[in-house]
């Protein structure tokens, strides 16, 4: 580009000189003043032309240098820990990028204010919503997370903890697998309840067809309920004192032994 511009300038200078000499052929005495003025004008025109061409060349070079130096300027303004992140992701293995994202998320959690950290329970619920109902986490994996269990116990009612929560989240075909764990949860629920209120549950076998009255029956009096509670307590104590092979004896034999 520069060589072409120099060639053009040289050709222009040669043309101007030949024209000036061709016009200066008449007598010098008559046209002496005019030749000097023409020479001055030509020199000024040539100088202006050279300056304009050199200025254009300098502007083009400055623009090219600015484009090449822009990444360096951008790198200087960036944080030292964030430089070359895109290049690093391109060079990494595709299977290792997700691990780096998890590490970055943990680092963000550490740098956040304790009062502004995301709730683990809310994130777990969001994960459950995005998963397929048949592919959600199994009950054993949930119970291994103490933070999730503590958060769940804080939000639930004391008498209703761990009873119906898992059955709602599990697949309908897998609810029967956890019947034993549900039985353990019911025992834990009975331990936490008041002793006088354990037998007021409609689903208990003690309030079956042999019960003197139903709890929901308006004709059932408090005296009958108290008698029923006393009979149940005496029956349980008698069964504890008996031999394991004789616990199936009728109620009359139990009363005679007492």
UniProtKB/Swiss-Prot annotation:
Keywords: Amidation, Cleavage on pair of basic residues, Hormone, Pyrrolidone carboxylic acid, Repeat, Secreted, Signal. Pfam families: TRH. GO terms for molecular function: thyrotropin-releasing hormone activity. Residues 84-98, 107-119, 184-193 have a biased composition (Basic and acidic residues). It is found in: Secreted. It comes from the Eukaryota. GO terms for cellular component: extracellular region; secretory granule. The modification Proline amide is found at residues 80, 94, 114, 133, 158, 172, 195, 244. Residues 84-124, 166-215, 236-258 are annotated as: Disordered. InterPro entries: TRH. Residues 1-22 form the signal peptide. The modification Pyrrolidone carboxylic acid is found at residues 78, 92, 112, 131, 156, 170, 193, 242. One of its GO terms (biological process) is positive regulation of insulin secretion. Belongs to the TRH family. Functions as a regulator of the biosynthesis of TSH in the anterior pituitary gland and as a neurotransmitter/ neuromodulator in the central and peripheral nervous systems. This is Pro-thyrotropin-releasing hormone-A. It comes from Oncorhynchus nerka.
